[in-house]
Amino acid sequence: EAMIGRIIVDPSESFLAGSVEDEIIFKSYQQFKKPNEGLRIGLLASNQNLYSNRRIIEAAEQRGHEIEFYNIRQCFMKLDATTPQIHYRGGKAIELLDAVIPRIRPAQTFYACALLRLFESLGVFCLNNSDSIIQSRDKLFSLQLLLKQGVQIPTTGFASSPLDTNDLIKMVGGSPLIVKLLEGTQGKGVVLAETKKAAESVINAFKSLNANILVQEFIKEADGKDLRCFVIDGKVVAAMQRTAPPGEFRANVHLGGTTSIIRATAEERKLAIKATKAMGLRVAGVDIIRSAYGPLVLEVNSSPGLEGIEGATQKDIAQMMIKAIEKQCNYAPKGV
């Protein structure tokens, strides 16, 4: 009768089963759902709308995978001997993931890496593992690891007491010099001290706040430029040059630096790969500066942004990251 218009069926008024929870509906229709033939990937990050995260989600879906975004702050864990689990706010335990892509802000390193360790113990492949991320985030430790593997860096000084300030300045060749906060990111907390007096003032000011700092030689011949080499699975897949805006020495894109495509030399590519391996990372953005005595590594970034490098090179870096996961998981996509 309803089919020919004689009876009106209003689900909100006439639904005999009453209100049905989403979980019951999901179970009822699960048998009719076409099984997903791709991998199940989790993107562990903070902001789904950032360019890098949107591109990763897009690339995974284009290659036939199911990808879920998990906000780091909304994950919580259960630790026990039999059924350790990671839960997501408002839902059940996160299960059956093949891989996790971590995109971690420095301020969330501690908690996010705790989540990653549990994923790793549950047999989930993490594109960058927790240990590698932790050591790459420690500026002093990462420089020590680089030197241990024979990777060249700018001459760097570190001291605990303000009483050693003068010796620290001499150690790196005097002024001008760079003062870096160990906790700084994206060029923040980096100061160029052009005179010895300015260097003393900056160092002592940071020390009075109990801040940990590094002092580094200033590479004048770099002329406000550096290279970002993007490394995936032991290969430099793209490289760009970053140029600081007028009146600035920092070339970070977040501070107004511009990007352009550049061909890294064989020596620079080798250095970037070596630096990435020293950190134990599969995916990294390696920042290199050209000096009078050869290329030097400034930093190894475990969550490198994609917007600058994809824009400068027109390469699909996000898809390369997904392919690296497929390779590790022995997955061969169909029709892609």
Q: Where are each of the predicted segments found?
A:
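Short hydrophobic segments within beta-strands
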Residues: 10, 44-46, 232
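C-terminal active-site "lid" helix and adjoining low-complexity regulatory extension at the edge
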Residues: 30-36, 263, 277, 290-336
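Phosphate-binding site of ATP-dependent enzymes
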Residues: 188-279
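Conserved hydrophobic helix-helix packing surfaces used for dimerization/oligomerization
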Residues: 7, 41-42, 177
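ATP-binding N-terminal substructure of ATP-dependent carboxylate-amine bond-forming enzymes
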Residues: 29-127, 132, 141
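C-terminal capping/lid region of NAD(P)-dependent oxidoreductase domains
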Residues: 2-29
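A conserved helix-loop-beta module that forms one wall/lid of the active-site cleft
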Residues: 61, 65-72, 116-189
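Redox-cofactor binding/interface segments in oxidoreductases and associated redox assembly factors
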Residues: 9, 101-102, 216
